[in-house]
Amino acid sequence: MRSVHLLIKPASGMCNMRCQYCFYADETSKRETPNYGIMSRQTISAVLEHALEAADAECTIAFQGGEPTLAGLDFFRFAVAEAKEKNRNYARLHFAIQTNGLAIDDDWAAFFAENHFLVGVSLDGTKEVHDCNRIDAARKGTFGRVVHAIEIMERHGVDYNILTVITKNTVRSYRAIHSFFKKKGFRYQQFIPCLDPLEEERGGKNWSLTPELFEKYLKQSFDLWYEEAMAGDKQYHRYFDNLLCM
């Protein structure tokens, strides 16, 4: 029995945000072709055809960016329909997407719910921490719009988790972030260490996460997570859960 896991970037490096720490923006700026545009339907159809020929147990199809929703909802409707049509081996299909949340409305949320997408939505914590770095093209903070998108998904019963980039500000505000996530009922969380630009001095940005700060974050947040878990109030923290499952 064979399982296949796909990671598809339907909008290449395109994004409707200008996050200060964006690794992809730094990486794409150094490529000969920074952006390949929106994936064609012919290409996504061919990718799914080959993947589903190989899969007869499970096939996980995940979409990432840049910002994948820039490909448009019709693109995703087409992709899901193609996957179901080409699933001649009757593999179990799983769909996932990682998004900044700005495009999410009732139509998107209904689509995610209908097709059982797992949605990873980027939220860096409290408004103060989030809006320091996660800004749009007009350099305005996006906290309110992201929280609103999450509320829309909750109304539609969409499965989602929270993706948080760990920066210097995260370490300073980890208790406030933890309390905010707990208050909002965000029980499934992934924390991703921030990376400095490839060709710049490490630790030179106002958001830079040094090894020492990352160590401090891990110790502080693990103690808090463990204390609550032992009290019967465990939240899913991907990094810690993975370590304990090793």
PLM features: what roles do these ranges have?
Residues 28-31, 70-72, 128-129, 171-172, ...:
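Short catalytic/ligand-binding loop motif for oxyanion handling, primarily in non-cytosolic enzymes
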Residues 70-189:
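Conserved AdoMet/S-adenosylmethionine-binding subsite of the radical SAM
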Residues 31-34, 131-135, 200-205:
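Short acidic, glycine/proline-rich loop/turn micro-motifs
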